[in-house]
Regions:
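Cleavable N-terminal export/targeting peptides
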Residues: 1-29, 172-175
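Short stretches within intrinsically disordered, low-complexity N-terminal or propeptide regions
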Residues: 15, 20-24, 40, 98, ...
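Short glycine/proline- and aromatic-enriched beta-strand/turn motifs that initiate or cap beta-hairpins
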Residues: 23-74, 163, 169-175
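Extracytoplasmic loops and strand-loop junctions of Gram-negative outer membrane beta-barrel proteins
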Residues: 30-34, 77-81, 148-149
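Solvent-exposed loop/turn segments connecting transmembrane beta-strands
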Residues: 34-47, 87-89, 117-127, 152-161
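Gram-negative (and chloroplast) outer-membrane scaffold detector with strong preference
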Residues: 51-144
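Gram-negative outer-membrane beta-barrel domains
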Residues: 121, 129-175
Length: 175
């Protein structure tokens, strides 16, 4: 009976230690992200970013973005190299906060709120960014993600841009 009480106390202490220990899987990790996507109307988007994850999969993202809007060539009547690459393009630098709203075993989803500034090769342009990221955790910390994004453009030719981006996240190994 005495041995049973000792074992019971040891098991209880072990269970309390397991419950009281905080899990730090992927907290405070950094990633390099690259994504490409299609945006309405007639646009393509490429984003390179650094993401710093804080507690509970919330994250800060610092990004560089390039957007190109193509159109038909007026003389040829179809899309040409010049009407694709030289029609309207913007680049921008920005920051976004991404609070986690959904978690599963190997997936999580985050809202994305941010702002950015850049140029359309003629003048200063700004954006208010809103969206949703869905992330799937792969081996060795890599992640695959898709993102629904909407941008409110300030001082640009587009008022709204919305679309879908797909990309991957590479862990940097730093915490």
């Amino acid at each position: 009976m005495k041995t049973f009480n000792i074992i019971r106390k040891q098991l209880l202490a072990l269970m309390l230690m397991a419950v009281a220990t905080a899990g730090y899987a992927q907290n405070n990790s950094n990633r390099i992200n690259f994504g490409v996507g299609a945006l309405y109307e007639r646009g393509f988007d490429a984003t390179l970013s650094v993401e710093h994850e804080t507690k509970n999969h919330n994250a800060w993202e610092y990004f560089a973005n390039y957007y190109i809007k193509y159109d038909k060539d007026k003389e040829a009547g179809h899309i040409t190299m010049d009407s694709f690459w030289k029609n309207y393009r913007t680049w921008g630098l920005g920051v976004a906060y991404k609070p986690c709203v959904y978690r599963a075993k190997n997936a999580y989803g985050s809202l994305r709120f941010g702002g950015s500034m850049g140029s359309d090769t003629d003048e200063l342009v700004g954006w208010v960014n809103v969206g949703y990221d869905q992330n799937y955790v792969l081996r060795r910390g890599w992640q695959l993600y898709w993102q629904v994004k909407s941008d409110l453009c300030i001082n640009g030719k587009d008022l709204f841009r919305t679309g879908v981006v797909i990309g991957f996240k590479i862990p940097t190994g730093s915490r």
